[in-house]
Every structure is written in C-alpha cells, then in structure tokens.
C-alpha cells in the first residue's frame, strides 16, 4: 500500500483555488492550504465542472502557522508544492519558510499565468535543483467575487480550456533533459485526472514552445490591460480611440516584441504577428466579458492582487539581460505601482473615486443616524424614568419632612414631660433628707446629739450611689433640645430606674424599721448585770465582793435633785409610748425601752429597786456638775436601752442633741473602718475622763467587735490612781477609746467574727468626733464623740451602776480620796 501524496497549495492567486477544488476529488492525497482567507469554506463555479463547495481541513491563514505546527509535530514533508507570489521579493521569503518541509524529491509548481520565465529567478532565490522547479499556467479566467467565493469568467461558446506544465531552463534548448520528461509526464497524468474535460499539455516537451505560450498569455496583459486603468477606460474596444493610447500601445508592443525576438522565441500564432493582429485578438477576447479583463476587474473591485512586479518588472529585467531598452515598460511600471498604492488607499495626495463610495457613505450616515436615534430614544426613556424617580423622591422627601416635623413636636412634648419628671425627681430627692425620720419634731431644737440613720443595704456603695446620683443630676440638668429621640428615651429610662431604686430603698427602710419595732416588742425581761469576766469578785485577787444592795452615800432627795439638774443632758423616760418615725422606726432613746440581753453572763436579776446609784457625790456637797457625760452605745446585737436616774426619766423636750437629727440611727456597716474627726468645741472646760480599760473577756465567749482605749495627757495621775474597771454587755464587742499624747485619737478595729455586728459608742466630749467603721460582711459601726445622745444616756445609766460596784469595793479608800470623783466624770482639778 502506497503512502498518500502530500500536497501543499500556498498563495492568494485565484487559480490556486481552482486547483484546490479539483484536488478534492483525488484519492489518497493529504492536502494543505495556506492563504489569507479567514474562512476554510470555499465555493468555485466553472463552466465545465459547475459549482463546487468544499471545506479544507488543513487550512492556515499564514505560512508561519504551518511552520509552527511543523516545529511542534515535526516530520512534515511535502511531495508537491503549488505556489504563487504577489511580488518578486515574496518568492525567496516563501521558499525559505517552506524549505524545512521539503526534501530532494519535492517538486515545485509555480503559478505563471500571465508571467514569463520565473524558474531561473526561483532557482536563484534558494539553493534548489532546477530539475525540481516547474511552471503551470492555464487559460482559465478565475476571479474572486467575495471571501470564499470564486467564479470563472468566459464566453458561452468556449469549447475547452488548457492547463500547461513545463520548464524554461534554457531559451535555446528545444527539448528537456531525460530526467525532466518523466516528471512532466507524471504531472500530466495527475492533472488530466483532476481536469478530465480540459486539455493538459506539455507542448511536446519543448521548452521554447512552452515559453512562447507564456508570452501569448502575458503580452496583452502587459501592453493593454494597464492602459485601461491609466486612461480610465472600461471598454477594451475603444482603447485605441484615445489619442494618448496609440503611442503607448505602439511603444509597449514594440519593446515586448523586441524582447521576444532577443530571446529567440518564434511566435507561430497568427494572432500575435504584429500590433494590429494582437490588438484585434485582444478586443475579440474581451468583447464578451462583462467586466473587462482580469487586471481591470481586480483594480476596480479590489478582489485580488494586481501582481505588478511579476507582470511588468520581470520583462524589464529580461530586457536588461538581453540588452534591450524599455522606457515605455519602465514608465508603465512606475505609474502602475503608484496606482496600486492609490487603489489600496495608501496614497497621501490622491484618493480613488468610487461609485459605491457615495452610496456607502449614505448608508454609513443612515446607520449612524439610526444609532443616534436609538440612543436618543434610550436617553428619553431614561429621562422619563429619572423624572418619575425624582417625583417619587420628592414625595418621599415631603413625607419625611412631615414625619420630622411631627417627630420634633412629639420629641418636644416628651422633652418637656421628661424635664418636669426630672425636676420633680430632683425636688423629691433634695426634699427627702429634710424629712423627719426619727420621730422627733423639728421644734425640739435638738443640737447636741448625733443620730446617724442610714440604710443597712447601702454599705460601701453609698458614696458611689451619691456620686452616681450627683452625676445623674448634672447630666439631667444639662439636657438640651438638640438631643435626639434616642437620647431622650435613654434619659427617661435612667430617670425611671432612679425612681425605682429610690422606691426600693424606701421599702427596704420600712421593712428594716418594722423588723426593729418587732425586735423591741419581743425583748425579754430585765436581767441583773453581773459584770464582765474581768470584774473583781470575792474569788479574784481577794477583792471585796460587790453588794448590789449597797446603801447610797447620799440621800434620795439629793439624788433626785441632782438628776433633775442633770436632766438637761439626757432624754426623758417618762413617755409611756415609744416615738415612731416616719419610716416606722422606734427611737430607743426617746422611747425609754429597757435594756435586755440574752447573754448567759447576766445570771442575776436586778433587785426590785428600779435604779442604781449612778454617781458617787464628791466633797463639793451636792453641787450639780456641768461636765459632759460619757455614755456607752451598744451595738445592734445588744439592743438599745435608755438611761434612767432615780426613777425619773429625762424629759425629751429638755434633751440636747447634736449633729444629724434626721439621719437614721443605724448605719450600714460595710467596708473598712473610716475615722472621722471633728474639732472639739469647748462647752465649759477641757474634757477629763477616766481611763476605761478593756475587760478580761474569755476569747471563747467574745464576739467580734472593736477594742478602743481613751487616754489623755491630763489624766496621767488619774490613770495611776483610778483602778476602777467598768464592764459592758458581754454580747457586744468591747470598745475602749484611748487618747494618745503623741497623736490624735485613732480607732483600731479587730475583726474577729464576720457575722457579728459592731456596737456604737458615744463618748461625751465638748465637741463631737465621728468615726465610722466598716467591714465586708458587717454594717459599719459608728463612734461619735460629742454631746450624749439618747442612746448614750441609756448606756451611761448602766455604766454608772457598774462604777458604783467599784466604789463599794473600795470603801476603805474613800476618806483618803474623798476629793476624787468616780464614774464617767473625770477628776476635776481646782
């Protein structure tokens, strides 16, 4: 089985499409086509073979694409190459590109219809053997109509067409060499199969006969067709009527015939003997052609290349080789080259007039007008759409303005309401601390007792709450109308939260007061105070036992008189009902509620007499003392009890109270102890007080509290001489204040039990010293140094009874120390 014949057709000449169409009917052929057509589908119409439509599988728009394919795959070698060129410079370039795809047996057929003697030029371009280069031409007039469509132009009475294959190796040779003839015979057989209705001729293997046939086809195209373009003549029959055409025709034909003669070619055809016969034969051939010769057709329709180099330059080069002067041919070549540039639109000064140009321009203008009209319609539609959108937006703006105005009005009303609420809240908050919370009327002119009523749930957060409340007042006072609705709502919520917080605190105070009232109502009966564990007894240090029925060293009337005079410093116990404040808080001082304790140390009942001897008279007779009292205030766990003297309670209207009369008597006991110190106000002399040492309590029975001691540099002698020990309730933590000579009084806390509550101690001084204690778990204890409160008077009564016990144990030293003064009144120096 023989391998397929690999054929390459390369070029843009219309005759190559004719050959391609005929190769599609051959078998066992691998066909490749390279041209500038963008479409691989073709249609060819001919007189004998009709219309043929075909598609090329191996189609390439340029020769470089084929070269790239060969570089990728490799091994692509063609057996036959049929090629054409538009200029002499293109021939060597094409041959160099396809040379890698050629071998020694590759045959080249160059399209030479209208051209002469190109084989020597091809051989000189590349190093190829002349035996492999041949020429092919035909009398078919194939013209390109449009892209991919070709048609044969001919007369209707044509009988046959010819295809000629040969070689022009030497002008003077009459026959080919023995190696060329078999190749030509093979070509003849091949093309005879491709063109069965045409004549494939070799001209009896005569190179001179083949060259003479080339001149017969090329002579009219060289001398007459270019003149039609130059003289702008479409009808060949009237060309010789031009005055300028006759000398040009004569000059061109004379030079061409001279070249033929120099080449030794005999023109045996009677139609090509002289100028008249050649012109007549040309007119007869072009008479039946509707569009004139092919060169004029290609110039007018710009269908194909004019091939000016191959058509005119090659005869000039031949004439130069044979020593023939060709001025007409050279002038014609120059003019046709410029016309070719003008036809392509490459001229800088001239432009071709085209009949279709005006129509094309009109069509272009109409198309542009239609496009602009379409754009105008689109713009109008978009304009109407935008207008509708503008109307909608304007309506939305109006509605939004109405909403804004209404919202402004509503916000203004809400702002006024919030301002009123804030003002009412401010007034209620500032008026509430001035309200009467302890049951004592403002007309009592209470100035000497500090009553610290505080909420038990406040703790260390009291200062934080005050700061937050103050910041809230500042923030509410700075409210302006420029705040938006969100800030107004936030402030309204904040005000409501503050109001709820105040209401919760008020309810908590009422609950605490109610619990306190129930606690006072559920107190056990009065018990005898036996003194703390450190009190001297018969079994301790040989001290004399304490006699509770000890006779008073002064008479009852004197005692009553003294207590009457001292009633200015204490509350009244004659009131039968306790005083209840606005928060249902029972004032234990003014109510005169007796002291009660659950401690196991009070093992004895107090005797039937109501009052103990509280103060031992001094040597200054029954002179009433104007010294301030030092009282003891127990903690919340020890309950409150009033101070009574000789059965006659102090009148509440005569009580002197210092400091805060509107505060709650219970302070929240949270946080670490905070010492507050007030300046001493001199009420008649310096304070002289006895040292109160802490009792010797058992640690197992002792609850958490505070241990304070009080000392003074003025009492150094009294400290050495006074050994009286005063005890307090064992249920409360002991508190002893000590005044150091080096530093001001300090309060030191010893927290022993987190669950115990801290007592309150009020010690009479010329001016009050207020001290707050706080722990993390217990409410803060409040220690106030100043004029005794009602609690202090009650605590002082018990303390005076204890001091009387100490006096009974030291009867033997009365005479020696008769100028001394006991109980809580310090020694008064003259």
Swiss-Prot record:
Biased composition (Polar residues): 433-444, 651-699, 796-806
Organism: Saccharomyces cerevisiae (strain ATCC 204508 / S288c)
Protein name: Protein PAM1
Location of Phosphoserine modifications: 659, 732, 767
Gene Ontology CC entries for this record: cellular bud; cellular bud neck; cellular bud tip; cytoplasm
Compositional bias annotation for Low complexity: 513-527, 538-555, 738-753
Residues annotated as signal peptide: none
PANTHER family according to UniProt: PROBABLE 2-DEHYDROPANTOATE 2-REDUCTASE, PROTEIN PAM1-RELATED
């Amino acid at each position: 089985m023989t391998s397929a014949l690999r054929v390459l057709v390369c070029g843009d000449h219309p005759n190559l499409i004719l050959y391609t169409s005929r190769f599609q009917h051959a078998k066992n052929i691998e066909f490749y086509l390279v041209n500038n057509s963008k479409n691989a589908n073709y249609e060819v119409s001919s007189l004998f073979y009709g219309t043929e439509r075909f598609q090329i599988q191996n189609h390439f728009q340029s020769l470089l694409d084929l070269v790239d394919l060969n570089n990728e795959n490799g091994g692509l070698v063609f057996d036959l190459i049929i090629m054409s060129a538009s200029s002499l410079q293109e021939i060597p370039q094409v041959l160099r590109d396809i040379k890698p795809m050629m071998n020694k047996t590759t045959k080249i057929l160059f399209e030479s219809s209208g051209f002469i003697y190109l084989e020597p030029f091809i051989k000189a371009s590349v190093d190829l053997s002349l035996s492999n280069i041949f020429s092919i031409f035909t009398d078919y007039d194939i013209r390109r109509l449009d892209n991919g469509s070709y048609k044969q132009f001919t007369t209707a009475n044509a009988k046959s067409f010819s295809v000629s294959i040969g070689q022009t190796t030497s002008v003077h040779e009459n026959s080919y060499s023995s190696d060329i003839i078999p190749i030509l015979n093979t070509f003849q057989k091949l093309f005879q199969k491709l063109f069965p209705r045409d004549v494939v001729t070799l001209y009896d293997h005569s190179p001179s006969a083949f060259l003479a046939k080339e001149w017969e086809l090329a002579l009219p195209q060289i001398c007459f067709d270019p003149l039609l373009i130059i003289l702008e003549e479409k009808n060949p029959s009237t060309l010789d009527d031009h005055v300028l055409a006759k000398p040009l025709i004569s000059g061109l034909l004379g030079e061409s015939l001279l070249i033929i003669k120099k080449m030794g070619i005999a023109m045996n055809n009677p139609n090509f003997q002289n100028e008249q016969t050649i012109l007549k034969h040309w007119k007869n051939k072009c008479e039946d052609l509707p569009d004139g010769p092919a060169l004029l057709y290609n110039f007018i329709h710009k269908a194909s290349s004019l091939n000016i180099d191959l058509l005119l330059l090659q005869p000039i080069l031949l004439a130069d080789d044979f020593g023939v002067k060709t001025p007409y041919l050279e002038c014609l070549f120059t003019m046709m080259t410029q016309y070719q540039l003008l036809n392509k639109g490459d001229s800088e000064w001239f432009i071709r007039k085209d009949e279709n140009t005006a129509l094309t321009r009109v069509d272009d203008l109409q198309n542009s007008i239609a496009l602009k009209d379409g754009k105008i319609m689109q713009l109008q539609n978009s304009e109407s759409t935008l207008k509708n959108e503008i109307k909608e937006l304007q309506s939305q703006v109006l509605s939004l303005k109405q909403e804004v105005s209404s919202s402004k009005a509503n916000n203004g009303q809400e702002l006024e309401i919030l301002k009123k609420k804030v003002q009412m809240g401010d007034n209620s908050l500032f008026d509430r601390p001035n309200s009467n919370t302890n049951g004592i009327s403002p007309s009592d002119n209470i100035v000497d007792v500090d009553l610290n009523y505080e909420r038990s749930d406040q703790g260390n957060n009291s200062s934080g709450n005050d700061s937050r409340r103050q910041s809230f007042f500042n923030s509410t006072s700075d409210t302006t109308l420029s705040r938006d609705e969100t800030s107004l709502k936030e402030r309204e919520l904040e005000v409501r939260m503050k109001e709820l917080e105040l209401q919760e605190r008020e309810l908590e105070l009422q609950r605490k007061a109610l619990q306190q009232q129930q606690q006072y109502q559920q107190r056990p009966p009065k018990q005898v105070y036996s003194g703390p564990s450190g009190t001297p007894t018969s079994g301790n240090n040989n001290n004399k036992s304490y006699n509770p029925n000890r006779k008073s060293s002064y008479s009852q009337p004197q005692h009553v008189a003294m207590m009457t005079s001292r009633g200015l410093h204490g509350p009244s116990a004659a009131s039968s009902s306790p005083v209840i404040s606005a928060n249902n808080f029972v004032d234990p001082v003014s109510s005169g509620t007796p002291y009660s304790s659950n401690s196991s140390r009070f093992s004895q009942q107090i005797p039937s007499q109501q009052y103990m001897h509280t103060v031992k008279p001094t040597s200054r007779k029954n002179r009433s003392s104007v010294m301030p009292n030092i009282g003891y205030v127990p903690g919340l766990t020890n309950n409150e009890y009033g101070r009574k003297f000789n059965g006659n309670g102090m009148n509440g209207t005569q009580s002197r109270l210092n400091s805060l009369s509107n505060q709650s008597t219970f302070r929240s006991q949270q946080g670490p102890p905070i010492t507050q110190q007030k300046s001493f106000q001199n009420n008649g002399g310096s304070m002289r007080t006895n040292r109160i040492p802490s009792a010797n309590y058992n640690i197992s029975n002792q609850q958490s509290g505070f241990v304070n001691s009080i000392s003074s540099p003025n009492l150094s002698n009294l400290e050495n001489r006074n050994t009286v020990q005063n005890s307090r309730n064992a249920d409360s933590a002991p508190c002893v204040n000590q005044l150091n000579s080096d530093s001001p009084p300090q309060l030191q806390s010893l927290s022993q039990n987190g669950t115990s509550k801290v007592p309150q101690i009020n010690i009479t001084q010329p001016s009050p010293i207020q001290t707050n204690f706080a722990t993390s778990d217990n409410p803060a204890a409040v220690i106030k140094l100043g004029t005794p409160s009602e609690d202090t008077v009650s605590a002082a009564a018990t303390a005076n009874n204890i001091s009387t016990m100490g006096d009974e144990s030291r009867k033997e030293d009365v005479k020696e120390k008769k100028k001394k003064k006991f109980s809580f009144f310090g020694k008064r120096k003259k």
